[in-house]
Amino acid sequence: MTNRKDDHIKYALKYQSPYNAFDDIELIHHSLPSYDLSDIDLSTHFAGQDFDFPFYINAMTGGSQKGKAVNEKLAKVAAATGIVMVTGSYSAALKNPNDDSYRLHEVADNLKLATNIGLDKPVALGQQTVQEMQPLFLQVHVNVMQELLMPEGERVFHTWKKHLAEYASQIPVPVILKEVGFGMDVNSIKLAHDLGIQTFDISGRGGTSFAYIENQRGGDRSYLNDWGQTTVQCLLNAQGLMDQVEILASGGVRHPLDMIKCFVLGARAVGLSRTVLELVEKYPTERVIAIVNGWKEELKIIMCALDCKTIKELKGVDYLLYGRLQQVN
């Protein structure tokens, strides 16, 4: 487990997708704004809760000493900036009660913390996770292609829908169904919604590629490195569901303009993984805190130029699609 978790960090920083769909969407500038910069409101609402800022540090790691070091850096950044942090899958701690890589309130007691578990795990383990972590919400991740590419991965999937229904009805905190960089299709969202899930992180292709990571760990299926749909493609495909479910976006988000494009396409909030991981691995924590705080001001600047006071108003912004996105239905 430890080596696999460390491999994930190592290879996540190496791969760069040859295509980023955010470059194929262009927002229409407004020349006569209605609001002052000081009027702009970054707050958002999802999973039954209000949040001051519309982006969060998404699930990445844990379960090793390297993972602990990364998590502690991320926790300090999240606490200092007031954004939510989601830990990586809690499965390592369930297997090893001595694992302390998730005990992040000891690092930052004011941390807004959520956590993550795989849908292959029965609901009893999800309940244990919530009891031990006391998270704001629980992400339940689906990663079928990653599992199939892992020599030690799961091969039994018929229980997943049953597990999901049980998570939706038996977990005492909000449950978010999360992809892991392959993108979530509309039919899966509809099915999960029917099973009781209201909030989805569609986590599209464009950032961390677990197909690439598993291939680097010894696989030979590099032709699957770019499997799945991009975040923008998933958001476009899910337009008809935006009034029925809550959509969060992650995957390939590089900067505040990419975040804004997600909000324009209906996302309630945006998760960042690799972008933040690169920062904490490259810079001192204080500088990363300054960068993340800077993102808040940059979001306000872009929103002001788009004549939008709130995140919700961004859904009314006009945009142009180019390249591959012109083919998305």
From Swiss-Prot:
Q: Which reactions is this enzyme annotated as catalysing?
A: isopentenyl diphosphate = dimethylallyl diphosphate
Q: Where in the cell is it found?
A: Cytoplasm
> Any idea which positions bind Mg(2+)?
147
Major localization listed first in the record, in broad terms: cytoplasm
Q: Which SUPFAM superfamilies match?
A: FMN-linked oxidoreductases
Question: What biological-process terms (Gene Ontology) are attached?
Answer: isoprenoid biosynthetic process
Disulfide bond sites: none
Task: Spell out the GO cellular component terms annotated for this protein, sorted alphabetically and separated by semicolons.
Answer: cytoplasm
| InterPro entries, per database record | Aldolase_TIM, FMN-dep_DH, IPdP_isomerase
For this UniProt entry, the molecular function terms from Gene Ontology, in alphabetical order, are: FMN binding; isopentenyl-diphosphate delta-isomerase activity; magnesium ion binding; NADPH binding; oxidoreductase activity
Name the keywords, alphabetized: Cytoplasm, Flavoprotein, FMN, Isomerase, Isoprene biosynthesis, Magnesium, Metal-binding, NADP
Supply the EC number(s). Answer: 5.3.3.2
Per UniProt, FMN binds at 59-61, 89, 116, 178, 203, 208, 252-254, 273-274
- Function statement: Involved in the biosynthesis of isoprenoids. Catalyzes the 1,3-allylic rearrangement of the homoallylic substrate isopentenyl (IPP) to its allylic isomer, dimethylallyl diphosphate (DMAPP).
Q: Which family does it belong to?
A: Belongs to the IPP isomerase type 2 family.
PANTHER family in the record:
ISOPENTENYL-DIPHOSPHATE DELTA-ISOMERASE
What name appears for this protein in its UniProt entry? Isopentenyl-diphosphate delta-isomerase
Organism of origin is Streptococcus pyogenes serotype M1
